[in-house]
């Protein structure tokens, strides 16, 4: 199965028809991020068969030009948002070297088998969580469950309560789950700094004889 097959299967379900209708309407009548062609970018950059790691975000950044369809990531010409700054600092502290993604564009991670998935895939300009409860959560919950059921030894990095609440969808006997507070300035000092998820992920991959991530 490819992501295309998996997504098309979801698109046949009744909830998705309602979701698509609502999202199409909002793209028509207001400013919505990311650009429509980037909604499923996380799926196009990380092939299902190459999947090693899932990093769950919440909804896309809601500032102009920030969202690009990958959780936490921004285009390289955009100033790094605070959460991204904190992620880069933790990588530096954890690994003793700078990230390959200092510019905030996490595309190199996605190409190494890291799925950067938001649980809500669209948002209106300036309005965080404005597309909450339209149906995206059903879609992404089903994607997480599909990964859990059909893959083995995927490492899930769950940062913050909303992401950690998805633990129930993941088979802990087949997969690895690392949790920490969210990297936002509000919670970064509650345990995101010092979580060492980047070195821990590579330790797990090494034990599995898989190629480590160049963070």
Swiss-Prot record:
Record's function text: Excises uracil residues from the DNA which can arise as a result of misincorporation of dUMP residues by DNA polymerase or due to deamination of cytosine.
- Subcellular compartments: Cytoplasm
One GO-annotated biological process of the protein:
base-excision repair, AP site formation via deaminated base removal
Give the UniProt keywords, A-Z. Cytoplasm, DNA damage, DNA repair, Hydrolase
Which SMART domains has this protein been placed in? Answer: UDG (SM00986), UreE_C (SM00987)
Give the organism's phylogenetic lineage. Answer: Bacteria, Pseudomonadati, Campylobacterota, Epsilonproteobacteria, Campylobacterales
EC number(s) reported in the record: 3.2.2.27
Family per UniProt?
Belongs to the uracil-DNA glycosylase (UDG) superfamily. UNG family.
List all membrane-crossing ranges.
none
Q: What is its main location?
A: cytoplasm
Q: What is the protein name given in its UniProt record? A: Uracil-DNA glycosylase
Question: Which positions are catalytic residues?
Answer: 59 (proton acceptor)
Q: Which organism is it from?
A: Aliarcobacter butzleri (strain RM4018)
Which is a Pfam family this sequence falls into? UDG
Q: Which reaction does it catalyse?
A: Hydrolyzes single-stranded DNA or mismatched double-stranded DNA and polynucleotides, releasing free uracil
Highest taxon of source: Bacteria
